[in-house]
Curated annotation (Swiss-Prot):
Residues 49-78 form the HhH domain. Residues 1-22 are annotated as: Disordered. SMART domains: AAA. One of its GO terms (molecular function) is double-stranded DNA binding. This is DNA repair protein RAD51 homolog B. Self-associates and may interact with XRCC3 homolog. NCBIfam families: PRK04301.1, recomb_RAD51. ATP binds at G128, E129, F130, R131, S132, G133, K134, T135. It comes from Zea mays. GO terms for biological process: chromosome organization involved in meiotic cell cycle; DNA recombinase assembly; DNA strand invasion; mitotic recombination; mitotic recombination-dependent replication fork processing; reciprocal meiotic recombination. Binds to single and double-stranded DNA and exhibits DNA-dependent ATPase activity. Unwinds duplex DNA. Component of the meiotic recombination pathway. Seems to play a role in mediating chromosome homology search, chromosome pairing and synapsis at early stages and probably chromosome crossing-over at later stages in meiosis. Probably is involved in the repair of meiotic double strand breaks (DBSs) and in homologous recombination.
Amino acid sequence: MSSSSAHQKASPPIEEEATEHGPFPIEQLQASGIAALDVKKLKDAGLCTVESVAYSPRKDLLQIKGISEAKVDKIIEAASKLVPLGFTSASQLHAQRLEIIQLTTGSRELDQILDGGIETGSITEMYGEFRSGKTQLCHTLCVTCQLPLDQGGGEGKALYIDAEGTFRPQRILQIADRFGLNGADVLENVAYARAYNTDHQSRLLLEAASMMVETRFALMVVDSATALYRTDFSGRGELSARQMHLAKFLRSLQKLADEFGVAVVITNQVVAQVDGAAMFAGPQIKPIGGNIMAHASTTRLFLRKGRGEERICKVISSPCLAEAEARFQISSEGVTDVKD
């Protein structure tokens, strides 16, 4: 692509500051009588919004160094006045859900079974074997989330945690070109971090929260959410510790989705389940993480290979989507419809 054509590409419509309808910055607690020093202690502990304080268990707040039990009660009271945590009517909830944005996947057929695309404000899990299209779909979403709302985008940046070293900026440039976006701007709007162990992966979420306070993000990707758990925890002896660590990580992801309204997309590896039935039907594959992963995901998608570059996505579980399948294709332009 020549430099002259690059200048003709549209820049993604990203808002540099959080919208007025976004979460309350943690500094808002000062207006409710919380001392600036205590607010700083909350922020240093990774609590960057009033919502994050309101959603935290009291025992977690008590663990913050330098904040007494009396101060914790005062902080909780102040946060609860700013963030409504009580009952609301189903009609109000319905009105709120009508405003939820879906991010296009790049394939109309896939968008159709997802009721418009990947839902913001919730966790979507994609699992499947190697080369089933999980990472390619994540790359495509990093571009489409930056599109205008009327084009199926979220007008926000993307945040990508890479646990397997499979993120490729060149793919982002190719996909941006397909959508007529300036490649350099699109890359600038993707915040990337490589995760090296499960503790590091969790710490990156604290950094992500502070970034989301500063500017609008529409998408957060963790590829893969379980890869490091398979290496950091081994054997049945560490299974309980692994599941507890994974549950806390997934809960932190859900809090980010709740606080900032981002679409959280996590990929998951699979393992072959070999039992007596497998002798006749072949080994069945199941996603890693067990019930903890299954319950944490709002929408669960199973991706598998088709013929050539064709892939098949099946909705496994969702509170609002019917069980259905869609075909899509992986090309140099990312995820597209199958060309028959």
